[in-house]
A protein has these predicted regions:
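N-terminal cap/leader regions of alpha/beta-hydrolase-fold enzymes
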Residues: 1-110
């Protein structure tokens, strides 16, 4: 089972991420990207599953720039809220967050 960690992007923005590490030495690192529903049970479960297979898996919370800890349901309300959130975040800044997540797991398995 993983844990919530804090990462810092190149622009200084601090954001949450869910990180699940394997019990032994990692075979590699993976960045799991959220859907419009945030880092929810499904995304955390994917990270845990990858960790069980030997990977250091991390899912950056890409909506943290607008609202922290977004965890939406797979229903009409969740879809509507997720679409609004995605439009509000844009594309450029989340790339910085993804780069920070890549850096966090880049040495795993080496």
């Amino acid at each position: 089972m993983g844990e919530t960690v804090t990462l810092a992007a190149a622009d200084g923005h601090e954001f949450g991420a869910y990180r699940a590490r394997p019990k032994g030495k990692a075979v590699g690192g993976l960045v799991v990207l959220q859907e419009i529903f945030g880092v929810n049970d499904h995304i955390r479960g994917l990270c845990d599953s990858f960790a069980a297979d030997g990977f250091d898996a991390i899912a950056p919370a890409l909506f943290d720039r607008k609202q922290s800890a977004v965890d939406l349901a797979y229903d009409d309300d969740g879809i509507a809220a997720g679409r609004l959130m995605r439009r509000g975040v844009g594309w450029d800044e989340p790339i910085l967050d993804i780069a920070a997540a890549i850096e966090a797991v880049s040495r795993s398995g080496k």
